Structures are given as structure tokens and as C-alpha cells.
Amino acid sequence: MTEKSWFETIFCCCCHRTPIIRREIKLGCFGIGSAGKTTFLKVLKGEDPRDLLRTNGFSTVKMEYDETFHLTIYDVGGDKGIRGIWSNYYAEVHGIIYVIDYSTDETFTESIEALHSLTSNPHVQKKPIFLLLNNQNNREFDDVEISNETKIQAGQHKIVLFSHFNKYNGYLDNIKSATLTVMARAKKDRNEYQEQFVRFIDSISEHYVELSEGVKTAELALRIRQEEAKEQRRLMQMKVEHDALKADVAGLELRNQPPVQPPIPPDPPSDPKSASVHIEESPPMSLASSTIPSDIIQSTPETGTPRDPVNFCRISQTSTKPVSPESNSVKEEPTIILKDNYFLPPKAPGRQYSRIQRIQNVLNNRVVPK
């Protein structure tokens, strides 16, 4: 068996070394407005916390804890109008950091009320909680009294750790320790809140698998809700575009449609007295009769001869005979057969009268009403 050279021994060990996979721990940092959440996270990371802006909404802070874990902390605003979004983060984190503002009695009471609302949420139960009392004015306090005010029951959470954080004294102004991990900085500075925070992370690492299952389930549900909301917005946009296109098509069809004609009124009802009157179709008018007046008609002859075509021409009106006394009671309607208003030529062969004579005979035989 050949021995390995020193070169192969060194480089083979480096190549076959198992890479360290850092697991992620997600935390949520909550508290009322101006409670000192961002200040605490800056100091925990080893950065200067001065000249900070007020957090509106939320911000994400990332830091390395040790060689095994790295931290992602959601710094959520604490104004009354923003506290409604706190519940959106409870299920998606492994643990809770809650900062209590102990500057005045009013801020302390408000912080305790917000804490009660937070711990009553079912997604917060069975998760580790780190309570940090931010004593900016260095007031005296009793740990037992404050713990009783929180009213957090034993066994309701995995573990509840309590610590306090006094006003920043500027010890990080000239120290560049931001490159250190949280664990290394805690061993170096040995502050009480850092030691309690390390215990808080250790409790999460002990139950990491169980807590991660809940976080993954919440993240999956969040992605499903986001996809559903995205699909709903897409469908709404498609509906708006479809309605707009439909309105454009309707406008074009209305523009190309011919104008609507007004309805034609129906004919008035006919007179029942004239129901017995029969209008016959007139034959084509001849040139010989084109000059006959239009009010002259030809009646059916009763006593005249067929050779006399002008003997029975009458005006189109009712009879002019005097009414007898016997006819006052019963009035008969004469039946008149109307024909076209022109003169027909004689039926006998040959013309016995000229055109002018026929017209003259018609005019002489007209009955003028008295």
C-alpha cells in the first residue's frame, strides 16, 4: 500500500471536509411605538444605535448567531395603527421578542395591555418568548412585580425569559465588533441581556424541528393565499378588459346601425255606411276619354238602348228625387255601383257621334242639384 504524500494529505482533507450548513431562525420583535426595539437589535448586532428613525411598517435585521444558526429578525412597528399586522407574523417565526417600555407608568401600562393581546393569540402559544424591559430612564423596578403584571401562565409557552436593557451608554461608539457573531459578542461583553438572549436561542435550537414544522406550514399557507390573491386580481383585470372591449363593440354596432324610422300610424276605420259600396278596377284610360271631367261617371242603363252611350250619365252623388211622406220613417240607403270617371266609346260598330258631340251630350245631361 503506497503512502500518500504530504500534498495529497493536505488537499484531500480540505476537499473532503463536510461543509457546515447554517440553519435559519426567524424571530419577531414586537412592542409599542418608541419602546426601543430597533435600538436593542442594533446593540445586539454590535452597531451604533444613535440617530435611528422611527420604524413604519416593518424592517428585516439579519445577523449571525454562531457557526450553526443565523438569525432573521422582523422588526415590526408598534403604533396603534400598525399593531393590527402583528398577527401576520406570529405563525411564521420560531420565537417572540417583546420589548416593554418602562419609561413612564403610562407606557408601561400600554405595553402590558399589548402583551396580553399578543400572548392570547393561539399561534404564539408553545413558542419561546424573550421579555426585555427597556428602562431608558433608569427607574427602579421589581422583577417579581413585573413578572406578575405580564400574567403569562407557566407551561403556556416553551420558555419565558426576562431581562432588562438600560439606556445606551455609548460603549459601542469606538468598538468595531459588528463582525463578531452574537455568541462571540456575548462571551466578550458578558451583559445580562446578552446571556438571557443566548439562553433564548438555545431553547429554540432544542425544539427547532418542531418549531420549523409550524413555520413551514404557515409559510406554505401564506404562499397559497398570495397566489389566490394574485389569481383573483388577474381575473378582475381580465373582467375589466372584457367589459371595456364589449362596450367598444356595442358602441361600434350602434354607430353602424341605420336610423330607426318612426312607426307609421294605422289607417282610420272605414265608414260602415260605405261598406256596401264596391269599387271596380278601372280599365286603362284611352286618349278619347282623357279630357272627360273627373266628376262624370257612367251608370248602368236601365231603360236606355245599347246604342245610346250618353243617355244615362250621372254625377257621383245620391238621388235628387223629392222625399215622400211615407219614406220619413224608413230611410233606405241607395246602392250605387261606382265606375271610373271617364266616358266609354259606343259598343255598336262604327262611331255614330264624333268626340266633341259625345262630350257635349254628357255636359247637357248633367243633373245639377237644386
UniProtKB/Swiss-Prot annotation:
Residues holding GTP: 31-38, 75-79, 134-137
Gene Ontology MF, one: GTPase activity
Annotated region described as RVVP region, given as residue ranges: 366-369
Keyword Ubl conjugation tagged: yes
Disruption of the gene: reported phenotype: Shortened cilia with various ultrastructural deformities and a disrupted association between IFT subcomplexes A and B.
Pfam families on file: Arf
Bilayer topology: Lipid-anchor
Ranges of compositional bias, category Pro residues: 259-271
Post-translational modification: Sumoylation regulates the targeting of membrane sensory receptors to the cilium.
Keyword Nucleotide-binding on entry: yes
Covalently lipidated residues, kind S-palmitoyl cysteine: 12-15
Compartments in which it is found: Cell projection, Cilium membrane
Outcome following mutation: residue 239 to R: Decreased sumoylation. Abolishes sumoylation
Crosslink feature (Glycyl lysine isopeptide (Lys-Gly) (interchain with G-Cter in SUMO)) location: 239, 331
Documented effect of changing residue 38 to N: Does not affect localization to cilia
SMART domains reported for this sequence: ARF, SAR
Tissues showing expression: Specifically expressed in ciliated sensory neurons throughout development in both hermaphrodites.
Residue spans of biased composition, Polar residues class: 287-303, 314-328
Keywords: Cell membrane, Cell projection, Cilium, GTP-binding, Isopeptide bond, Lipoprotein, Membrane, Nucleotide-binding, Palmitate, Ubl conjugation
GO BP of this protein: cilium assembly; intraciliary transport; non-motile cilium assembly; receptor localization to non-motile cilium; sensory perception of chemical stimulus
Segments of this protein annotated with the region Disordered: 255-331
Subunit structure comment from the entry: Monomer.
Recorded family membership: Belongs to the small GTPase superfamily. Arf family.
Described function: Cilium-specific protein required to control the microtubule-based, ciliary axoneme structure. Required for normal sensory cilium function. May act by maintaining the association between IFT subcomplexes A and B.
Entry protein name: ADP-ribosylation factor-like protein 13B
Source organism of this protein record: Caenorhabditis elegans
